[in-house]
């Protein structure tokens, strides 16, 4: 399996993200939705990747597909990260596919069809967008932009997150909320922002993008400062350099 094969499969899958005519269903509440495009993209990806790597497992957002513990190699898939954005015609929505080997990511692809930005990385080989090498910025915390969000699916954590975000806002330059984890981590990887925080995410939200970020020179961990769990939900913090990472981690720990 090569990164170029994976890129080709992801690009083909994007053809199933129709611009109109998709069905919308609620999953766990009015905030969490799934479209018929999510299901179609995931089914296509699983079928194609199973043909190329028959012995691999899958950890996917839709249909509760999870046999990651049974396989040496596991595909971690979010068919559309930012489904709410997708359903409203907002550009920040992405197909995310990562290949996990043991406890580490080996490949990651994040594709934003509406902006035609294909982010990808292989372990130890750098990070790229549309064939061009990308790298994090060198901006300091006080000149940095923080990408973040309130916990729309876990509103019981709203007060904690608000305190963290307000504290960080007083120390950084500005804040952005794009409504999709993977695109935001890729933006960090290419220098469009410098800081990232979310209180609780699923592994398919961040797995593929986490490799792209680290290969671009960034740092990412759980909200407690531990290595990311690639099979269970986790809080996530990330930054463009060690000093900014430590400052953001201190803010998160102070309010958690």
Specify the residue positions occupied by each region the protein language model found.
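Oxyanion/phosphate-interacting regions
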Residues: 1-8, 163-169, 186-256
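N-terminal subdomain of lithium-sensitive/metallo-dependent phosphomonoesterases centered on the IMPase/IPPase/PAP
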Residues: 1-80
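Conserved beta-strand termini and adjacent loop/short-helix elements that scaffold enzyme active sites
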Residues: 27, 61, 178-180, 223
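Active-site-adjacent structural elements in enzyme catalytic cores
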Residues: 51, 66-135, 211-214
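Residue-level detector of anion-binding/catalytic polar loops
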Residues: 55-57, 174, 194, 219
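Short, Asp-centered acidic motifs that coordinate Mg2+ and/or phosphate
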Residues: 57, 107, 145, 194-195
């Amino acid at each position: 399996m090569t990164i170029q094969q994976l890129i080709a499969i992801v690009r083909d899958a994007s053809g199933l993200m129709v611009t109109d005519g998709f069905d919308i269903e609620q999953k766990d509440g009015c905030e969490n939705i799934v479209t018929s495009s999510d299901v179609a993209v995931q089914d296509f990806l699983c079928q194609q990747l199973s043909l190329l790597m028959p012995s691999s497992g899958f950890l996917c957002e839709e249909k509760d597909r999870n046999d990651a513990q049974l396989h040496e190699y596991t595909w971690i898939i979010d068919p559309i990260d930012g489904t709410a954005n997708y359903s409203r015609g907002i550009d920040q929505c992405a197909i995310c596919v990562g290949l996990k080997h043991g406890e580490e990511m080996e490949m990651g692809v994040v594709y934003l069809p509406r902006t035609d930005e294909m982010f990808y990385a292989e372990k130890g080989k750098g990070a790229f967008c549309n064939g061009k090498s990308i790298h994090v910025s060198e901006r300091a915390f006080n000149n940095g932009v923080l990408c973040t969000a309130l916990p729309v699916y876990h509103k019981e954590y709203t007060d904690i997150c608000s305190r963290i975000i307000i504290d960080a806002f007083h120390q950084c330059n500005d804040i952005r909320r794009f409504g999709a984890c993977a695109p935001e981590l890729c933006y960090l990887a290419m220098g469009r922002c410098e800081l990232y925080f979310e209180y609780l995410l699923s592994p398919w939200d961040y797995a593929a993008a986490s490799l792209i970020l680290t290969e671009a020179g960034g740092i990412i961990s759980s909200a407690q400062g531990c290595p990311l769990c690639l099979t269970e939900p986790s809080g996530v913090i990330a930054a463009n350099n060690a000093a900014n990472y430590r400052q953001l981690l201190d803010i998160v720990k102070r309010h958690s």
